[in-house]
Regions:
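Alpha-helical solenoid repeat scaffolds of the TPR/TPR-like class and their adjacent stem/linker regions
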Residues: 1-345
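PAPS-dependent sulfotransferases, especially Golgi type II membrane carbohydrate sulfotransferases
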Residues: 143, 172-182, 186, 193-267, ...
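Short beta-strand segments
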Residues: 275-277, 288, 300, 352-357, ...
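Conserved nucleotide-binding/hydrolysis micro-motifs of P-loop NTPases
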Residues: 303-304, 360, 381-386, 440-441
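ATP-dependent adenylate-handling active sites, centered on carboxylate activation for C-N bond formation
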Residues: 348, 356-359, 368, 375-376, ...
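Conserved phosphate-donor/acceptor-positioning beta-strand/loop module used by diverse small-molecule
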Residues: 367-390
């Protein structure tokens, strides 16, 4: 027990109602993994002082760690309203927005934190990290230098510099920069996991595949250790969720599944497209190709079906409720969907709307039931490339990315997702078109013409400028670096790691054969 913990405990015991004491105890409880106790203490602090910026910011941090990002940003905003000059609230807001993929807004918050507290290395490092993610070498250097001047061992700033060095083809300096920092013994952290991943990328580019694989494995181990408390054994993991949906669909009678629309839904697009497949299958590339056409709007990995998810996918009885839905009962879920699209800043009425989410294959029963006129694009890529890419890519924390912490776990998740997707295609009335990644990168014009024909869109040479579209729109997925380039052929990357992939090939073999990649 530290002095601060003991002092706070004693102060509360003698009736001192200063909210700071509750915040101190909450922090220690959270560090000990006692999250419920931490939340209770912070709520007590906010009962005493509802506008206390320290308590509001601390609970926002817990919400962020638990992926309750909306609650987190709302509490940051409340802290800022209470004390606009409280730099820690702006910094936490940057963390939250960055976690949610809202990088432009995150930079604004980090910048305000740095303005208010120029000696805050984390604020400068956050700015550098996002600039590095955007591939902007010039924008990385100043904030990274400021962060490292304050904290020479700052892994976020060092990894940001390393990221742009890799994009510039400078791999050896990355090894020299990151290896000494990562050699120091330290508890697992998200910062170490990210830096290890960047170091693995440098080894990969240098052709040092054994070292790359070992470093990627270490990165995933750190990632798993940091986030393991969020996944106690009694919690359904993402693969379990997929399997449960599959069992429900397998037992359902999907004849006459498509529902008519009871009435017009405000804000609906004239043409509605779902683009799905699996992470790292090429969905971001196709999204930006289509968004290069006039009249096409696209949205990237947003929970547009959240209300329907909660109503129909939350328990085993959900499918019965979905099957018994009348058109009038379905329309509020459709309206909620289009309201989500509008809330993202898109006006899609009169045009084509592309809802890109590689994991919306999970929602094909909902899509078929609620949006029977929608067109569904399914990305296909060599399963070995997908699994290898998911394993070595540094994703933001989600229940899905937690499945990518080992090659075997990644392969089993992919297998579960493909089984559910294929079952959905067999059982449900869906209007689908398959886009093969290998065909897209090797026969771009022919593949995109077929894609446009399916969607009823005019083909244009502007499709070749998808990288400009991506730069203008911004990309929040892990594919940002690839789609900033001109057409990038990522096929057969798995071959250099064939030895490491051998143990999972029996899991992937049926899909390699079924999809024609043998």
């Amino acid at each position: 027990m530290t002095d601060a913990f003991a002092e706070a405990s004693a102060a509360i015991a003698r009736g001192d109602r200063d909210p700071f004491h509750y915040v101190v105890l909450a922090w220690y409880r959270a560090q000990a993994g006692e999250r419920d106790a931490a939340y209770q203490l912070l709520q007590q602090a906010l009962t005493i002082a509802p506008d206390d910026p320290v308590a509001l910011t601390t609970i926002a941090s817990l919400y962020r760690e638990d992926r309750r990002l909306r609650d987190a940003v709302l509490h940051c905003d409340a802290a800022i309203r209470a004390c606009p000059t409280y730099a820690a609230a702006w910094l936490e807001r940057g963390f939250v927005l960055s976690s949610g993929g809202s990088f432009a807004l995150a930079v604004e918050s980090y910048s305000e934190a740095a303005r208010l507290d120029p000696g805050n290395a984390a604020a400068w490092a956050g700015i550098a990290m996002i600039a590095g993610r955007n591939g902007d070498a010039e924008a990385v250097r100043m904030p990274a230098a400021k962060a490292l001047a304050i904290d020479p061992d700052n892994l976020i700033a060092s990894a940001a510099l390393a990221t742009v060095e890799i994009e510039a083809g400078e791999y050896a300096p990355v090894v020299a920069r990151l290896s000494p920092l990562l050699a120091a013994k330290a508890p697992p952290s998200s910062e170490r996991a990210n830096a290890l991943n960047v170091l693995g990328d440098a080894y990969d580019r240098l052709g040092r595949t054994d070292e790359a694989f070992a470093t990627y494995t270490a990165a995933k181990s750190e990632f798993a250790a940091v986030h393991a408390p969020q996944f106690p054994p009694e919690r359904e993991d993402h693969r379990g969720f997929i399997d449960r949906i599959g069992r429900s669909l397998d037992g359902a009678d999907a004849r006459g599944w498509a529902l008519a629309q009871a009435g017009p839904v405000p804000g609906a697009a004239d043409s509605h497209v779902f683009l799905l497949g699996y992470p790292r299958s090429g969905t971001t590339l196709v999204e930006n190709i289509l968004a290069s056409l006039p009249g096409v709007s696209a949205l990237e990995e947003r929970p547009t079906l959240r209300e329907a998810d909660e109503a129909f996918l939350g328990d085993d009885a959900g499918f019965a409720r979905l099957a018994g839905l009348s058109p009038a009962e379905a329309d509020p879920f459709r309206a909620a969907y289009w309201a989500k699209v509008a809330a993202a800043g898109l006006d899609v009425a009169g045009g084509t709307f592309v809802d890109m989410d590689p994991l919306k294959g999970l929602r094909l029963p909902l899509i078929s039931r609620l949006f029977p006129q929608a067109q569904v694009l399914i990305m296909r890529r060599d399963p070995r490339d997908i699994v290898w890419s998911c394993f070595h890519t540094n994703f933001a924390m989600t229940s899905t990315s937690y499945e990518f912490t080992s090659l075997e776990r990644t392969a089993r998740h992919y297998d579960a997702m493909m089984r559910l997707t294929e079952l959905s295609l067999e059982r449900l009335p869906l209007n689908t078109h398959v886009v093969r990644y290998d065909a897209l990168v090797r026969e771009f014009d022919a593949t995109t013409r077929a894609l446009c024909d399916f969607l009823g869109l005019p083909w244009s040479v502007e499709l070749h400028n998808f990288n400009r579209t991506a730069a203008a729109r911004g990309v929040s997925t892990a594919s940002a670096a690839q789609v900033r380039k001109s057409l990038y052929d990522g096929t057969r990357q798995w071959e250099r790691y064939a030895k490491q992939l051998e143990p999972v090939l029996p899991i992937l073999a049926p899909w390699i054969e079924r999809f024609g990649f043998d």
